[in-house]
Every structure is written in structure tokens, then in C-alpha cells.
């Protein structure tokens, strides 16, 4: 039985909406949820369809800093294998940069390849996106948070940056490939 394309699309969007709702309701009863998964960038047409008011905080970091950070981890943990025949640390710096930036299965390559799409969607849905340079966030976190709260339409909460509580649950960031 072939379904009408519009009915199928409406059903699919509702399926996604209910799945996401159930996912986050199982984790928290808080009215606002931040998901830091980079994977959302690959599904913006879907997420904007099931929640046209969804918000996307995009924090951009200087690419040079990211590469230096990745490379310092490589030298700190040379035993970690990266999908190649030659140990990754033995590749030239230029070859490593190419791998970091072009490998769409890597921590950097995948979000980097999605960045033009994210910026295009952010232009089209400018009220849904807040783009912030990580350097600005690091230098003036209080001001950055004030702008974020204002963008969200939420009352500002004064953060104590010297006493950040542990989260309610442990999130093992290393499980995220992208």
C-alpha cells in the first residue's frame, strides 16, 4: 500500500517529535533541555519541522586552536589508533591536518563538512540560531550567558563560575564520534 507523500511526511515528523519528547522526558523534568550533540546539524530540516521554535546555540572555535588541541592529544596518547596503516603520529603535520579536516567520520571533519549547511540554515532561520565565538565565551562568560539568556527569552541566572556543580548524570563525551 502506497501512502500519500504528505501523509507519510506528517507521520514521519510526528514520529520524530514524539521520539525526541520521550527521550528527553526520560532524562529530566526540566522545561528546557540543551543537547550538545553535533549530529543535530545533519537534521536541521527535520528538527525545524517538528519544532519550528527550536533553538540552536552554535559555538565556533578557531580552527587553528582545534587542530592544535587534537594534535596535542595525539602526542599525549600516541597508542590510540586512528584508522590508517601507519601510526597517526608518524604522518606529517600537513597529512594530519588533512585527515582532521576531511575525514567525515572524525571529531572535526564531520562537523566541519556540515558547517556551510548550518550557516545557510542559520541565515534562513536567524531567530532560531545564536552563533558565538568560543574565544568570546571564554573571555567574557558572564556577558555571553546574558546574551544567551536574552536570546532564549529566559530570565538571567547569575552563575558562579568558581563553583560549577557536577551534573545530575555523567556524560561520557568520548563515546561521540562526531
Briefly describe each language-model feature range.
Residues 161-166:
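Acidic/histidine-enriched alpha-helical segments
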Residues 172-178:
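Short, intrinsically disordered, charge-balanced linker/junction segments flanking boundaries
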